């Protein structure tokens, strides 16, 4: 079985490449939960680009064109595939930011891969072999969310499906484990365990504080714990931190309770970079488990 790459470099069409893994400085995957409009996407991308430049850190712009697993059938899902793809291309061309979005079916993979740099596999779909193989076949980098039901060591088989299909540019992303009803917990051991697979490891700090279905027809969340868990994950030595952010989370169409206000993102990112600098200095990011 082919092994995953320890380092992923996003270079295509970018003046400033973004490097994930291999002991390099952390990368942020950041943006609003769902794409609300072209204007909103461009405005948030512009602000994140300015933060990227000020902090000298790589940021991958993320947003979802379709929230396909909302709690309620009446909940807002996003602007849809056809409307979103040219906006992703415009964000990259205008702001020199690589982009990431979710795919939910094999049929979406080729079209989405023409517009974004990273395909993301949702946690609920992380064991769907046909979806993983279709995503792998695009040749794009793949970020796989670990299912809330999955042990960290089980991600080895998930990663092997993509790497074994000939695409070594794959990341494992922790987003919390189910702990009773409407609750997730983050087991920091899992980050070190997944690093032993050999691929870059991402920590999703915002979905880890989600309370799935906790508000009846939508999910709740505890955004005050995002910095707490993010600091812990960076101290463990993750390669990237995933943070959903919005200028007005309390009025966002989805995942508002666990999104970080955009005007607080830069301070949080700067703090996490300081933790990451220490992790690099101490060799934590490349240290084997038990060493």
Predicted regions and their residues:
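Catalytic beta/alpha-barrel core
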Residues: 79-80, 94-108, 117-130, 141-152, ...
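Active-site-adjacent loop and "lid" segments of alpha/beta metabolic enzymes
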Residues: 74-82, 95, 118-125, 181-188, ...
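N-terminal small/glycine-rich loop or linker at the start of catalytic domains
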Residues: 16-35, 64-74, 200-215
């Amino acid at each position: 079985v082919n092994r995953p790459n320890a380092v992923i470099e996003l270079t295509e069409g970018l003046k400033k490449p973004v490097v994930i893994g291999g002991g390099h400085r952390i990368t942020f995957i950041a943006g609003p939960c769902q794409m609300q409009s072209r204007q909103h996407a461009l405005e948030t991308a512009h602000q994140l680009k300015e933060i990227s430049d000020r902090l000298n850190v790589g940021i991958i712009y993320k947003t979802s064109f379709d929230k396909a697993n909302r709690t309620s059938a009446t909940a807002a899902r996003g602007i849809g595939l056809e409307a979103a793809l040219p906006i992703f291309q415009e964000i990259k061309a205008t702001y020199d930011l690589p982009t990431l979005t979710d795919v939910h079916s094999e049929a979406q993979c080729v079209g989405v891969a023409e517009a974004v740099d990273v395909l993301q596999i949702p946690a609920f779909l992380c064991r769907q072999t046909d979806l993983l193989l279709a995503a792998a076949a695009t040749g794009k980098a793949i970020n796989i969310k670990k299912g809330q039901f999955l042990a960290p060591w089980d991600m080895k088989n998930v990663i092997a499906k993509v790497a074994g299909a000939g695409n070594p540019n794959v990341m494992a992303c922790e987003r919390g484990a189910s702990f009773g009803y409407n609750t997730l917990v983050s087991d920091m051991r899992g980050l070190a365990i997944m690093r032993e697979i050999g691929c870059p490891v991402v920590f999703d700090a915002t979905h880890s504080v989600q309370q799935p279905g906790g508000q009846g027809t939508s999910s709740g969340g505890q955004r005050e714990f995002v910095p707490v868990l993010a600091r812990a994950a960076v101290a463990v030595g993750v390669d990237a931190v995933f943070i959903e952010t919005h200028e007005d989370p309390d009025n966002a169409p989805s995942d508002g309770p666990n999104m970080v206000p955009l005007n607080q993102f830069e301070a949080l990112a700067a703090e996490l970079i300081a933790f990451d600098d220490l992790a690099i200095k101490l060799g934590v990011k490349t240290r084997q488990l038990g060493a």
